[in-house]
Amino acid sequence: QTQSFFYSLELGWKSQLFVTTTGRNDWASQLANSPQKSFFYPSVGVSWLPSSTFNFPEKFNYLKIRASWASVANPFPRELTIATHPYDDTISGWDDKSNYPIGQLYPERTKTWELGFDARFLHGFTLSASWYRADTYNQTFNPNLSASSGYSDIYIQTGHVRNTGVEASLGYDHQWK
């Protein structure tokens, strides 16, 4: 079960500068007996329309510059921090716990940065480009253990994955009359 709180706030100034922020806090039952009882993930975005601030030539009629940062989280699988035994319907009884006892687990996190712009020019062309970087850590894995350990697997949190990239699109919108 997950209980959550969410907010969103958007502010604009003179139709040219905008700030958006969001936040969510989750209290997930998967976090029982873990050092972190809830997790908060915020975001903030800023955009500016220089084409509304300055007088641009008619052939270059729109420009938006944007930046954002966000942090998101996922809880780990259920019942990992509670010493419970799974119920097996096929035998109408409780199975032995097969995973090695766990220490401290934390929610998986991804933090993302993005910078970009959107433009319209020459009566129908559009150009959008973005650079992004996403860092993910506290990933939960369960590698197999040797049968001699008495357990089949162990849950560990490890790794740091970084994704970086550039996205761009060029378009043309023309209406035949």
What is each PLM-predicted segment?
Residues 1-177:
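Extracellular/periplasmic, surface-exposed regions of secreted and cell-surface proteins
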